Amino acid sequence: MTVHPLYATNDQQPAYALRYSWTGWVTRGDVLATTGDAWTNLKCAWESDGLRLLDHLVRNNEVHLTFSTIPSVSPTFIAARAKGRLKYAQRIAGAPVTFSRKVSIRSVGDNTADAVEGYIRAQVRNEGFIDSHFSEFLEQFTVMSPRVDLRRPTETNSGRYWYNLHLVLVTDGRHRLVDDAGLTTIRDSSFRIAAKKEYAIRAIAVMPDHVHIALRGNLEHSPEQIALAFQNNLAHMLKRGAVWQHSYYVGTFGVYDMRAIRMAGSKKCSAETR
């Protein structure tokens, strides 16, 4: 018998803040050192891919692009579209360039990895539960994984990727799960889901009516796919029906935040190791 998922792309109303910096290295030619029209056309093309160009900077042989994206866009898709459309625009302009095979993609946000991890770690304390015994009980469902370092990149043949996501799921109707079995299932099953999908959970806080997860994603999977994987699999393992709202929050974060990227426009960019 076919098991149909409880959650799908077309029934979601997500909230998201997804931003990435892309760096490519030119080995031959000059990148769009001509008119601003070329960048305007590129922005329109990238928009059709679900990538909004927030900023661009060309320094020596380095090209730095900052995008915001929709949840259906994965890091590997960004890598392909960023370089592919840039090379095509150069060729059309009569100034073809050659890029290094390797690129760098970093997830960035308004908060750093330290801030996100600290926020998740403090969930129980920040809720201010009146019942101290219940607070102590909940602490066991907040887990920090010391073996997972979100500051380290995923190395591939095509470059280096930092793909860090903060995912939040909320129970339907803010229904509170307070039983040991249910909370344990969410905590332990989240790690099993991550292992199967090739994600790496750095921090998780299972609360009565929501769950926070900070993780490194599979580069081939979009934030949307990752959210749906947790929604569907956790609901299946809980055996309580559609326990989650048909929505989620997902945001990117990294070693440094958007403020550092904004400052890069007025300062010399630090070289990234290829």
Give, region by region, the residue ranges found by the protein language model.
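Charge-rich, low-complexity N-terminal segments
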Residues: M1-R274
